[in-house]
């Protein structure tokens, strides 16, 4: 069988399987296909003008989701090449080659929002997935076993931050009989403010850049899609524009403007792990977000002077009382997952630029480095809440070290042992007591001591253009 015949066979198999999987997904929700099509059309017929940033983002993600099932926004059938990607795998090369990313962890979060996650996790646990495994992965594994997700053309995974993601991709690769590509990321390349070891950084950048070139060949081999440099340059330009607006919004809301938004909702953007980098529409989403911040600061009544919190990690996506309770008594003024830690990328040197952004992620370095980096830019009087799932080995295991570093820096710190997806161990009454004590301590401090001024290190580390 020729390569062209193999690709045609995959397309034919995927087309049939995705039709069944879409019906399975709708059945889970208790929705008929005709009703679903009517809803999809009505949602996407509305002009983007006048939509909020959150609505634009939601519509973009919904459109990407249905396209993975070969559905267009007007509900016609069109085959879409799909790459399952792990949460921290860059997406620009995929968009440049007309490959739609499908992020299983994001789908797991959506299951939790709908209250459909427990059954998926139980399915996974009944099939030998351990209960102490990441709940995002368990939910996704259950969905795979129940045949709810769209069959991929390929799977692409990175090795950093999420330890079980490559193992899960290997499981899915065997299940669907589709090829997997693993991007190997060296650990601990980001060195903090001074970044002394230039040689080590450049070697890591070159190592990962060569793998991105291999990824292009992998995609062409298994999908038949040819690579065009000019298309990747355009995608990189869109990522740079989106970066500018996201970063500008972050800085305005934290240092200059009154936080008029619900910070718990802003965590939903989860920009530095999102699959929308490289799309034209995400530029408009982040621009609109910034404009909403500015407009809100100019027109809204000042909020009561409440303690301000920087949020570490993600949040519970299931229905919960925690986030609303915190925001009754404090402001979530910033968060880890929206931080923009990288420089503008060079569209004329795309592989090295993507590699540099990937290896220089502060979250994938020694705990002491990323914690001390946080101490350089936080406003005096603000505190940190770290919501760490016990199943997330990478972050949960770091809380003791972080606590000691932040205590030395006089930054109040609270680590909450929770879970983003699995609510079976949720105990709000216990957590509430700890939150009350923490916020009471923040109120005793002098809040807002440096508000409106950026510490000098922000210019050195976060404001590099």
Question: At which residue positions do the language-model features occur?
Answer:
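A charged, amphipathic alpha-helical module
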Residues: 2-81, 206-344
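Short, well-structured alpha-helical segments in soluble
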Residues: 139-150, 372-380
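C-terminal hydrophobic structural anchor segments
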Residues: 368-414
């Amino acid at each position: 069988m020729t390569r062209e015949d193999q690709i045609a066979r995959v397309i034919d198999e995927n087309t049939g399987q995705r039709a069944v999987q879409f019906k399975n997904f709708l059945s889970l929700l208790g929705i008929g296909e005709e009703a679903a099509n009517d809803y999809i059309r009505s949602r996407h017929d509305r002009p983007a003008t006048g939509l909020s940033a959150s609505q634009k983002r939601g519509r973009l993600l919904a459109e990407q989701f249905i396209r993975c099932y070969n559905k267009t926004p007007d509900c016609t059938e069109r085959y879409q090449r799909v790459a399952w990607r792990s949460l921290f795998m860059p997406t620009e090369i995929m968009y440049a080659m007309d490959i739609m990313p499908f992020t299983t962890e994001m789908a797991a979060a959506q299951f939790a929002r709908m209250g459909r996650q427990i059954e998926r996790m139980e399915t996974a646990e009944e099939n030998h997935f351990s209960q102490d495994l990441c709940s995002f992965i368990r939910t996704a594994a259950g969905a795979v076993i129940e045949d709810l997700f769209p069959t991929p053309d390929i799977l692409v995974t990175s090795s950093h931050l999420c330890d079980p993601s490559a193992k899960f991709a290997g499981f899915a690769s065997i299940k669907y009989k589709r090829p997997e590509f693993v991007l190997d990321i060296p650990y601990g390349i980001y060195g903090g403010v001074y970044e002394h070891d230039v040689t080590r950084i450049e070697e890591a950048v070159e190592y990962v850049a060569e793998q991105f070139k291999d990824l292009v060949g992998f995609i062409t081999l298994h999908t038949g899609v040819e690579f065009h440099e000019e298309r990747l340059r355009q995608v990189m330009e869109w990522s740079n524009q989106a970066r500018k607006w996201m970063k500008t919004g972050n800085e305005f809301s934290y240092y200059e403007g009154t936080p008029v938004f619900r910070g718990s909702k802003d965590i939903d953007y989860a920009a530095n792990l999102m699959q929308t980098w490289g799309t034209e529409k995400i530029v408009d989403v982040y621009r609109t977000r910034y404009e909403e911040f500015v407009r809100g600061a100019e027109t809204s009544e000042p909020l009561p002077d409440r303690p301000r919190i920087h949020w570490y990690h993600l949040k519970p996506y299931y229905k919960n009382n925690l986030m609303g309770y915190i925001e009754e008594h404090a402001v979530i003024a910033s968060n880890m997952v929206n931080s923009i830690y990288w420089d503008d990328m060079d569209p004329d040197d795309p592989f090295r630029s993507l590699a540099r952004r990937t290896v220089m992620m502060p979250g994938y370095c020694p705990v002491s480095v990323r914690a001390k980096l946080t101490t350089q830019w936080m406003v005096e009087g603000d505190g940190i809440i770290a919501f760490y799932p016990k199943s997330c080995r990478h972050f949960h295991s770091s809380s003791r070290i972080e606590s000691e570093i932040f205590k030395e820096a006089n930054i109040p710190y609270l680590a909450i042992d929770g879970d983003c997806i699995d609510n079976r161990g949720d105990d709000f009454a216990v957590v509430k007591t700890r939150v009350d004590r923490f916020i009471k301590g923040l109120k005793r401090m002098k809040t807002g001591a440096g508000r409106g001024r950026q510490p000098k290190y922000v210019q050195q580390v976060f404001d590099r253009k």
